[in-house]
Amino acid sequence: MKQIEVKKIVKAINASDGAGVKLKRSIGTPEADYIDPFLMLDEFGSDNKDDYVAGFPPHPHRGIETVTYMLAGDFEHISNCFNTSMRMRRKTCNIVIFIF
């Protein structure tokens, strides 16, 4: 098996996005701006509902792919584009490709 050398470990920084959702961002920071094609890699995890309840107002998804992997807990993803919702639970993965 080929060994891969770790060149750099990037520490996630506290950030907020959308309507003030608190998160930790590791890709999409100035320290990791050389990583391509990723735009962002975020971790959401809080027991405080106020950290995430505001959500993300309508925003464009054209030409992107989202990957969501739930390590623990559950949440409901509501799409403003398609008027659909999906509940995710622990150890599930969701991949959505937006090509329109």
Q: Language-model features: where?
A:
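A short glycine-rich, His/Asp/Glu-containing loop-to-beta-strand
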Residues: 16-71
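Hydrophobic alpha-helical membrane-insertion signals
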Residues: 1-24
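Glutamate identity and glutamate-enriched acidic tracts
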Residues: 5-8, 31, 43, 65, ...
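Histidine-centered active-site/metal-ligand motif
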Residues: 59-61, 77, 97
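A short beta-strand-loop-beta hairpin characteristic of the jelly-roll/cupin
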Residues: 53, 65-89
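Conserved metal-binding segment of the jelly-roll/cupin
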Residues: 87-100
